[in-house]
Amino acid sequence: MIKNLRPFLLAGQVIFTLFLLYFAVRLVCYHFALVTFPYPNGLREGAMMTSTNALVHGLDPYDMSLQPQLMNPYGIVYPLIVWPFAALFGTTILIHRMVTAFFILASCAFIFYVLRRMNTSIILSIWSVLMLYASLLYPGTSTPTIDPGAVGMFFMLLTVFIPWLCRFSYRSLFVSILFGILAFYTKPYAFLGTIILSSYLFFFVSKKKGLIYGAVLLALSAISVVAVAYSLPAYFDDCFFTSLNMTHSWESMQRLYYQINLYSRLHQWTLLMICVFLIWHIFNRTKVRLQDPARHGILLTVWAGSWSAFVLYFSLGRHSGAMLWYFFQLLSPFLLVGAAWAFNRIELWPILCTPFLVLNLLTMTAGQDYKVFYDHRDGWPELTMVISKYQNILNSPLIASLLVEQGKPLYDNGQTEYFLSGAERNGWMRGFFKQDDRVYLQMLMFFKDIRSKIENKEFDLIILQPSLLPLGVGDEIKEFYKYEGQAVVYAPQDQKPYAVTLWRPL
């Protein structure tokens, strides 16, 4: 029967390939327009640029005296990677987005390599990669902007898959640990890769290797924590305690269920075909025969996906400020690898799967039209021109990246407001760590400085969002500054318009 269907199978593969080519071009065009858009793509996109800019000027971005203006809750690795390029070409929006783009593409290339090592067909491997690419560019998410998420995800994937690719040799386990620690200092939740691998080693490969991996990981992590805390004084206030202390304030079960629902709808055709695959094997009473289950990538992939789903449900998926990027970074790589591997085991996949997989790519890319970056520039050139005429501007986070590009001081990088949360040591933490009173003192001095500058009219211009009028000094602004009007600009990747108010000294 299969022999008689070969012409149709070949035709299905050809048609599928043509669709994949179309979606690849569509995604590349969208990504290029996103990267080259010369204005902010989101409200807080400038935050990471402030850390890079500090490094370029020989400063420690986690120096307590530079807080809260340089508050960075994510980690030091992303700014360190961008640093040499910024030193050569300037601390620009473009340079940062290009680095992000590189790691998005590197993650896609690595997933393709993993699939090929799992003997998945080239066409299905490309489909999986394009689905991941579309996920990482999805409108409304921060991954493709000036954000360390793509870098952290890349290191997490290396942490998980390198040992499998190298047959779990001790050398590969050590490399995995190093990438896991790098992932932690890029975005802390990317440390999940080490938990996935250590547990997988213990249960499916070798208890000895699992214990050795965990012990070495613990030792090197402890050494790194001591070294980082000593050399970067505000690091753990910014990157660890802030997030830990704010967990309860941003937890939302409603947000979790909304994201699960949206993620499921975006992948409905893939999930449907996974169900078909399972039914296919149940009714045919076939088993997935793995010569060595511990060494087979699909078992590791399912294990990693299960861990990711667990973390999303009980923690990160409840973040009220997140919109799918945790799902796309932590779950999608493993879901799509598993899906492509499964479809490849259905002999008739070019006929049975192609229509549904094309529909899923169509669903994922429906909102990714590159024209949005050219059609929504109104107001940005004028606002940028106004900024260029003044030196000392009390700023909205929205324009932080523009101030960095123009070499001007800034006062709110988009994360500044969260700095105070890093001082507290709650719950069991009180038994091990002291409250950091330096944070309270630094924040008090910051507010005092802002208020003094307003009263003395030291700001040449104030540009703030109406809702952020701001930082406890709204009355002083109205007393010493004159309202000049409002500008409305659009952030394409955020899919939001932002209004800013302009004030000049009386």
Give, region by region, the residue ranges found by the protein language model.
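Perimembrane helix-loop-helix junctions
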Residues: 2-4, 193-221, 246, 279-293
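Transmembrane-helix motifs of polytopic, lipid-linked glycan transferases
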Residues: 15-18, 98-119, 134, 158
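Extracytosolic helix-loop segments that constitute the early lumenal/periplasmic catalytic or substrate-binding loops
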Residues: 46-70, 77
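Loop-to-helix entry region of an early transmembrane alpha helix in multi-pass inner-membrane enzymes
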Residues: 76, 80, 88-109
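Transmembrane-helix signature of polytopic, membrane-embedded enzymes
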Residues: 111-135, 153-154, 170-171
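Membrane-interface alpha helices of multi-pass inner-membrane proteins
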Residues: 157, 172-188, 194-200, 308-314
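Hydrophobic/aromatic-rich transmembrane helices and adjacent perimembrane loops
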Residues: 192, 319-347
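Extracytoplasmic
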Residues: 360-506
